[in-house]
């Protein structure tokens, strides 16, 4: 058992104190990074590929380790988005503008921003190439390139998004279309899909279904809506405890769930969706819709698929406990682009960042990593405009809950955490390299027991 004094007086004291002050103390904005230009140098101690959640977080951590002038981030995008909030944007509960900030404002101060796209990785020569023909070498490489959205793998998309009845919470270009389709709904089928590929935030495709059902009830349209969730999977959720809770909600709210159904075509002009039956190859079904929410197929970024750092499926091939590459000891991976066998979420990235920080630290000292990632990930399953089931679990698909109560129950407190606390932690702590997940809070709330 860990005494309370040991928790609050150790190296996590600053973070713990900050959590206690949430809601009573304002935190200033991130320091603006003004060096948004191509690198003047062509070699860095630590080179980070990708300016998403994993890339920015690790750059902040590496800055403290080797100095800002020795760290660079390769990222072409002008804006950085907190994507988990898009579930609420698509349901009209948050504004899209609240989810994004200029990339320059989240790059750690002093870290070089190489505003370019990676076109080739050459780990045998410790260098990468960019789309402006620059060659950049490194001593340590962190790959945080995220996951690629493949709307075009569905016939009729992305051009079908020009029609007003279709939306998708997975893209900044289409998330507001979900809210428009929801508002314009009159009568008929509201269809929500889950593709036959790995996805980021695997709970999001059904979260918008629950929110839509709540919206229909709120606006008096529920009796006119036939709500359908067509998923390529064989279960509603991968962890039994939470799957059982979700099944109860599905039954109570009269939602239709069809398993092993994969969206292959959208006929937007006819308002029809075509699904293949994964259990019976060649068998298809056409369903008309009044509203369609599409979760696109996803894959590793193209630059990784043929790279030496990728496994056979195209994901960065890392050790699942240390996040160190299996073949190149000075290469590391974090987040959605890796083959880590856990759910691809921002919460997973936070937990991974603490482990990877420790891994790189000991490798820099020519030591063997001992700190191990347990696969922790979290999915706040939004089941209404004021209710969330907070799913937390590990590699074994066993619950790994932070709070000392049953998190499979719908709770207002967990919704407020999803809507307000988590964005605060993301912008003000995680991206600054000070949030490595709730493991220490779990020990505190459970009186030191794992």
From Swiss-Prot:
Disulfide bonding pattern of the chain: 201-379
One CC-aspect GO term: mitochondrion
Location (main, coarse): mitochondrion
Chain positions found as N6-acetyllysine: 173
Location in or out of the cell: Mitochondrion
Mutation effect (residue 213 to K): In SQORD; severely decreased sulfide:quinone oxidoreductase activity; severely reduced protein levels in patient cells
One Pfam family this sequence matches: Pyr_redox_2
Entry EC no(s): 1.8.5.8
Note on cofactor: Binds 1 FAD per subunit.
Active site: 201 (cysteine persulfide intermediate), 379 (cysteine persulfide intermediate)
Cofactor(s) recorded in Swiss-Prot or TrEMBL: FAD
GO molecular function: FAD binding; glutathione-dependent sulfide quinone oxidoreductase activity; quinone binding; sulfide:quinone oxidoreductase activity
Catalytic activity, as annotated: ubiquinone-10 + hydrogen sulfide + sulfite + 2 H(+) = ubiquinol-10 + thiosulfate; a quinone + hydrogen sulfide + glutathione + H(+) = S-sulfanylglutathione + a quinol; ubiquinone-10 + hydrogen sulfide + glutathione + H(+) = S-sulfanylglutathione + ubiquinol-10
Ligand binding (FAD): 53-54, 75, 83, 118, 336, 344-347
Any one GO BP annotation for this protein: sulfide oxidation, using sulfide:quinone oxidoreductase
Function: Catalyzes the oxidation of hydrogen sulfide with the help of a quinone, such as ubiquinone-10, giving rise to thiosulfate and ultimately to sulfane (molecular sulfur) atoms. Requires an additional electron acceptor; can use sulfite, sulfide or cyanide (in vitro). It is believed the in vivo electron acceptor is glutathione.
The family this protein is said to belong to: Belongs to the SQRD family.
PANTHER family xref list: SULFIDE:QUINONE OXIDOREDUCTASE, SULFIDE:QUINONE OXIDOREDUCTASE, MITOCHONDRIAL
Disease: Sulfide:quinone oxidoreductase deficiency: An autosomal recessive disorder of hydrogen sulfide metabolism characterized by a variable phenotype. Some patients present with encephalopathy, clinical manifestations of Leigh syndrome, and may have a fatal disease course. Others are asymptomatic. Additional features may include lactic acidosis and decreased mitochondrial respiratory chain complex IV activity in tissues.
Protein name: Sulfide:quinone oxidoreductase, mitochondrial
Provenance organism: Homo sapiens (Human)
Gene: SQOR
């Amino acid at each position: 058992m860990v005494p309370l004094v040991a928790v609050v007086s150790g190296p996590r004291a600053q973070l713990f104190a900050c959590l206690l002050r949430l809601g009573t103390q304002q935190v200033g904005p991130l320091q603006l990074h003004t060096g948004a230009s191509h690198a003047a140098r062509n070699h860095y101690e630590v080179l980070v590929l990708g300016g998403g959640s994993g890339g920015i977080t690790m750059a902040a951590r590496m800055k403290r380790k080797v100095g800002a002038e020795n760290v660079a981030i390769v990222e072409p995008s002008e804006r950085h988005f907190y994507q988990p909030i898009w579930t609420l944007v698509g349901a009209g509960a948050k504004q899209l503008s609240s989810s994004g900030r200029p990339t320059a404002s989240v790059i750690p101060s002093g870290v070089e921003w190489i505003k370019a796209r990676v076109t080739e990785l050459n780990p045998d020569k410790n260098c990468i190439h960019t789309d402006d023909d620059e060659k950049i070498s490194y001593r340590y490489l962190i790959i945080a390139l995220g996951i690629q959205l493949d709307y075009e793998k569905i016939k009729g998309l992305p051009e079908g998004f020009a029609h007003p009845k279709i939306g998708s919470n997975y893209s900044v270009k289409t998330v507001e279309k979900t809210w428009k389709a929801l508002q314009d709904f009159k009568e008929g089928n509201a269809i929500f899909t889950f593709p036959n590929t790995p996805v980021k935030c695997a709970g999001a495709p059904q979260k918008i279904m629950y929110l839509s059902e709540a919206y229909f009830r709120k606006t008096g349209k529920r009796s006119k809506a036939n709500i359908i969730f067509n998923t390529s999977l064989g279960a509603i959720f991968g962890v039994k405890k939470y799957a059982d809770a979700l099944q109860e909600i599905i039954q109570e709210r009269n939602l239709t769930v069809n398993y092993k159904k994969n969206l292959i075509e959208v006929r937007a002009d006819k308002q029809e969706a075509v699904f293949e039956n994964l259990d019976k190859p060649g068998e298809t079904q056409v369903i008309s819709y009044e509203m369609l929410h599409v979760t696109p197929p996803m894959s590793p970024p193209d630059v990784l698929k043929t790279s030496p750092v990728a496994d056979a499926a195209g994901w960065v091939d890392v050790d699942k406990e240390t996040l160190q590459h299996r073949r190149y000891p000075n290469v590391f991976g974090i987040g959605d682009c890796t083959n880590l066998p856990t759910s691809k979420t921002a919460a997973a990235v936070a937990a991974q960042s603490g482990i990877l920080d420790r891994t790189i630290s000991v490798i820099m000292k020519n030591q063997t990593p001992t700190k191990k990632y347990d696969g922790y990930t979290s999915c706040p399953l939004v089941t209404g405009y004021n209710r969330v089931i907070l799913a937390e679990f590990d590699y074994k698909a066993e619950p790994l809950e932070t709070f000392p109560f049953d998190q499979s129950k719908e709770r207002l407190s967990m919704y407020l955490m999803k809507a307000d606390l988590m964005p605060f932690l993301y912008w003000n702590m995680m991206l600054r390299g000070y949030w490595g997940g709730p493991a220490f809070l779990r020990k505190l709330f459970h009186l030191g027991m794992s």
